[in-house]
């Protein structure tokens, strides 16, 4: 990514390396970093196999993405590609940047027509994931497509993105594809990362996205970016993430804060863990209060969270207590593994975890 081959002559814990690579879904990164290194051949062979698998998945995604966007163009439906599909071009090799799904934004009033377009492309809607802000559709080969009606949800700053359509403009090639100016694209990148970070973690891909974005767009209006990020409380987070990215991929030296953030990002996987989400999501001063708040939040989630799982709450919010009971019984009969995992996470929390979470929040807030 930065043109360097990893130095690993004195490294020996390859089992741990592969574990963290899997947690971060970073097989492509690892493959390119180690293919010409002195890493053991069995490790490089494993990375090559995993790399071939994720590239195959990416090819399938791009096929369906192209078909869907062509159909939207044909029907004059404006759309804004977001997340991985817009960031891939920043990488030295596009196949380095893999995505779990294909995301794009459409206007809420266009969603019925978008659904018809997806059906005509051979996709099937996942009716168990009907949410307030996006649909989930599946295609053969394990491809997932997510058309969004809003850029952000379930955050205190979601309102900032309500009218983001006003900041879009046509790409100018005669299609219905829209784009954002560079600064607004970066603001969404940071806001999306910040949302995941404060809910448990955002993974190493985010650091790479930020570093490469800034490396390509050196002429951004930094005053505008800072002012807008201040509005959503993410300006300091941006500063710390940029500094950390420069430690990882540039020439900056790691300090104590960088080490703390690095450990948090690596341990959290792509989107963080339930445990880290619980620790980051409470302001409790003790481990017992943190555990209590965590269990209460798991048993009785707020209205905005359950709207995604139970769309009836959008029109009838007074049914929230009923949906709490429905959700509990649903978990008992269909998601016992989740219950066991949540109880295990709660039981493993200690004072050190609480102090670490407090330190991380101090660094970015």
Descriptions of predicted regions:
Residues 1-100, 106-365:
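Conserved NTP-donor binding/palm subdomain of two-metal-ion nucleotidyltransferases/polymerases, i.e.
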């Amino acid at each position: 990514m930065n043109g360097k081959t990893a130095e690993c002559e004195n490294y020996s814990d390859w089992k741990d390396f592969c574990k963290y690579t899997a947690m971060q879904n970073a097989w492509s990164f690892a493959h390119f970093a180690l293919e010409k290194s002195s890493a053991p051949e069995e490790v490089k062979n494993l990375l090559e196999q995993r790399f071939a698998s994720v590239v195959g998945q990416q090819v399938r995604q791009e096929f369906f993405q192209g078909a869907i966007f062509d159909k939207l163009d044909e029907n004059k439906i404006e759309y804004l590609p977001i997340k991985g599909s817009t960031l891939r071009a920043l990488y030295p090799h596009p196949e380095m940047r893999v995505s779990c799904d294909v995301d794009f934004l459409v206007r809420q009033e266009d969603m019925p027509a978008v659904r018809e377009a997806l059906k005509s492309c051979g996709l099937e809607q996942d009716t168990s994931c009907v949410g307030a802000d996006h649909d989930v559709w599946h295609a053969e080969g394990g491809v997932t497509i997510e058309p969004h009606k809003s850029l952000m949800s379930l955050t205190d700053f979601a309102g900032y993105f309500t009218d983001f359509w006003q900041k879009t403009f046509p790409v100018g090639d005669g299609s219905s594809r829209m784009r954002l100016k560079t600064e607004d694209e970066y603001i969404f990148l940071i806001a999306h990362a910040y949302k995941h970070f404060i809910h448990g973690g955002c993974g190493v891909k985010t650091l790479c996205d930020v570093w490469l974005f800034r490396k390509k767009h050196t002429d951004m209006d930094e005053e505008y970016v800072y002012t807008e990020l201040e509005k959503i409380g993410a300006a300091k987070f941006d500063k710390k993430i940029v500094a950390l990215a420069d430690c990882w991929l540039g020439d900056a030296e790691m300090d104590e804060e960088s080490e703390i953030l690095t450990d948090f990002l690596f341990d959290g996987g792509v989107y963080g863990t339930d445990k880290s989400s619980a620790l980051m999501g409470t302001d409790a001063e003790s481990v017992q209060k943190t555990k209590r708040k965590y269990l209460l939040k798991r048993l009785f989630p707020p209205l905005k969270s359950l709207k995604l799982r139970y769309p009836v709450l959008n029109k009838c919010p007074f049914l929230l207590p009923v949906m709490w009971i429905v959700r509990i019984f649903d978990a008992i009969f269909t998601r016992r593994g989740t219950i066991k995992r949540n109880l295990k996470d709660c039981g493993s929390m200690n004072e050190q975890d609480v102090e670490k979470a407090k330190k991380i929040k101090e660094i970015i807030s």
